Amino acid sequence: MINEPFVPKFEKEEKPEKKSIYIYNTHQSETYSDGTTTYEIGMELAKMLEEEGYYVYFQTGNFLREAEEEGLKYNQLYTISRRHINDTFAEHGGFDLVIDLHRDSAPRSASILESDGVTYAKMMFVVGMKSSNAAHVMEHSRQLTDKINQVMPGIMRSVFQRQSVYNQDMAENMVLLELGTDQNSTEEVRHSLRILVEALTNGGIE
């Protein structure tokens, strides 16, 4: 279920001096072990980054409902997100970072990092190698992986390459982040959110 959305403060006429971030979820209904969705976690990430002083645009709407109304299947949701990305870029211009936030499916043993009594959800960037921007996205994903691992060593899995596009042809600074898996709890994901925000705040966004 998709709850009431976080309403971003980013307006077209307020083109910011500070860094701007666009967050959306192609698969908004992906859930963690206790039922929280990636859409809800995306809203939390947006709020956290806004509190750090970034301009954040969080993509609202219900992609799955739109797909159903148009007779599209779940595996065609990238068609829906692409349309929203186009509209957002047209309305707001470019962003310093674009994040498509997902969660992966993996065994529990590959999903967690334990450090000082805290359990974190592991994270991973995915690069669509069929995208015309694959080289740029790969470099950016590797740099972010290193930056996040500097904050919490071992929290990042290696960048994963797939023979797909994931709409990454639309911007060189667009990344697909798998934040945890279906085996992670919301608490574990929130621990990782704090690491992600710290890394982005301390030089993770060029």
PLM segments and residue spans:
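Second-shell loop/turn segments in exported
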Residues: 28-36, 45, 67-76, 127-135, ...
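Catalytic-core regions of hydrolytic enzymes
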Residues: 34-112
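A short, glycine/acidic-enriched catalytic loop
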Residues: 107-133, 141
